[in-house]
């Protein structure tokens, strides 16, 4: 079952997602990537996180780009969830940044900058945006919020 559909408190969601951020950073430190770390692919019990449904085999050649994509997709999937506040999403990003290699965070930020034009191209559609597009808006806004703290 999709745990986001459960009636969890904000604090319970925060704990689960902070644990997931640490687990994703640990996965990346081991030279592994998920491919699409969506909320539905995260199992959690008593602080233990298990990722399921891996989408990609990591190759050394493009590992840094794959890690950056993993992190972006993880954040994007959080941003698509109406039930998650921007505060929780920013806390999760901070936790990943705290646990990852500094270059991994910088690679993700470089990817965001590379595709920034998409954000501006999509802004005129904000008033009619649905879940996927709102997720893109929130992704850029939350990353900017966390970047201000650097």
What kind of region is each of these model predictions?
Residues 57-150:
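C-lobe/activation-segment region of protein kinase-like
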Residues 2-3, 103:
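A short secondary-structure junction motif
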Residues 3-40, 45, 49, 71:
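Conserved kinase catalytic-core helix
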């Amino acid at each position: 079952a999709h745990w986001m559909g459960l009636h969890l408190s904000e604090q319970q969601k925060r704990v689960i997602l902070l644990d997931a951020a640490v687990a994703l950073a640990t996965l990346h430190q081991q030279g592994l990537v998920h491919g699409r770390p969506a909320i539905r692919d995260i199992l959690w019990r008593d602080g233990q996180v298990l990722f399921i449904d891996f989408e990609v085999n990591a190759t050394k050649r493009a590992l840094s780009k794959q890690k950056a994509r993993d992190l972006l997709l993880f954040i994007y999937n959080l941003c698509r969830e109406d039930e998650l506040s921007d505060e929780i999403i920013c806390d999760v990003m901070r936790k990943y940044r705290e646990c990852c290699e500094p270059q991994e965070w910088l690679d993700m930020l470089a990817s965001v900058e590379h595709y920034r034009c998409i954000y501006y191209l999509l802004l005129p559609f904000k008033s009619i945006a649905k879940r996927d597009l709102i997720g893109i808006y929130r992704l850029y806004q939350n990353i900017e919020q966390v970047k201000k703290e650097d």
